[in-house]
Amino acid sequence: MKIGLFIPCYVDVVYPQVGVATYKLLKHLGLDVTYPLNQTCCGQPMANAGFEKQAIPLAEKFEDKFKEFDYVVAPSVSCTAFIKINYPRLLEGKHECTTSDKIMDVVEFLHDVIKVDHPLGTFPHKVSLHNSCHGVRELGLSSPSEEHVTPFNKIKDLLNLVEGIQVLEPERPDECCGFGGMFSVEETAVSTRMGLEKVRRHIATGAEYITGPDSSCLMHMQGVARKQGITDVQFIHVAQILAAGL
């Protein structure tokens, strides 16, 4: 099983430690993982801003870069969801599209494909779990509160394999943090207020850390928190916790 590691542009530039942790975690599990060089953006920012034509060349390059792999794994639910859902439409009649069936968020991959069931790293801290919208409603990482289904949470399942951790959840656990990509730019006041309310609910759990599978949500909440002078809680990606102490 050959795995191609996709590191989204914002992770590469702003949170490279998340990419390193993801690679480290996959290698620790004995997997054949490769990081293809000269990766680029998946095209999501352009497409979400209404410039889908400009996103197509990036989608084509992504396809060419990752077509040889059995799975493409990324530490980003939003980019993973964009590729999975939108590439077939963007590339229809223009370019072969195979990666939409291969790409998975790292949580989804470890839980559903590798089926990790043994202890991972060590992280003796209280963490509050943030369930990102794309992860809940497009990738199925956890059960959405608006649907009457048996509750499940793949992120929590993996975190509970970490030694010493205490996983907490805020009130209204799958409510949006307010980031939403372009939404945070076009509706800054609303986005900021949503982020602040979300951070406050996370802090109310008594957690030392706020964690989640998407660095964009964590980036937004961290920015809002720091602007308000909130420094008594830290922000960390799920992959970093799973890889801690390995």
Language-model regions, residue ranges each:
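Iron-sulfur cluster-binding electron-transfer modules in prokaryotic oxidoreductases
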Residues: 1-246
